[in-house]
Amino acid sequence: MELLRTVSDTKRTFYALHTRPINTIYRRVVEELMVEMHLLSVNVDFSYNPIYALGVVTTFDRFMQGYQPERDKESIFSAICQAVEQEPQRYRQDAERLKAVAQSLPVNDLVAWLSQANHLQQDADLQAQLQAIASNPNFKYSRLFAIGLFTLLEQSNPDLVKDEKQRTEALKTIAAGLHLSDDKLSKDLELYRSNLDKMTQALAVMADMLTADRKKREQRQQQASTPVAPPNE
């Protein structure tokens, strides 16, 4: 019998793949995403789908905004995916494909498609996935899947997701069509949006601190380089 990989196994693999240190403010983001993906990957009811992939990519990209050095971000993302035995390129490609589909559709058509009220021909694979989700009583819902749905709506019509009434109605329609809990979906997305706001605020504070620190260093350097006049005899 094959032993299930543990969270410790996944973390060990990640840090073997990405050996550079991760900035403190982002380490929690990376580890929480990695643990969430790990727990899903070992769940018997979980199966990969492109909406989940879009949620993973969106979560990583949004919460890693401002990360320095910038060149390390793709290495970190790749290591997260490989640590849970997934292909990072598949996640990126599926996410880009779904965003392009969402951008090409009026939001009402997108909601009707996601809720399976209408079957559109834009993406046969996504259509098959949506049908499979709607007909699977054991579908493993996740916060990352919810973020994928939210991102699709956001890509189709950014104004809709900013309007609470329209956003709530769209999510309820989609949840009903896919047989998901609309209460769980809404709560997960409220938490996601709240955490994004907190991260934005934390980054702003950090940027202010760095600016203040840089100004102090410049002042010290300027003072050190200013010649001291000899005392008058």
UniProtKB/Swiss-Prot annotation:
Residues 213-233 are annotated as: Disordered. The keyword Coiled coil applies. GO terms for biological process: photosystem II assembly. Transmembrane segments: none annotated. Belongs to the THF1 family. May be involved in photosynthetic membrane biogenesis. This is Protein Thf1. The gene is thf1.
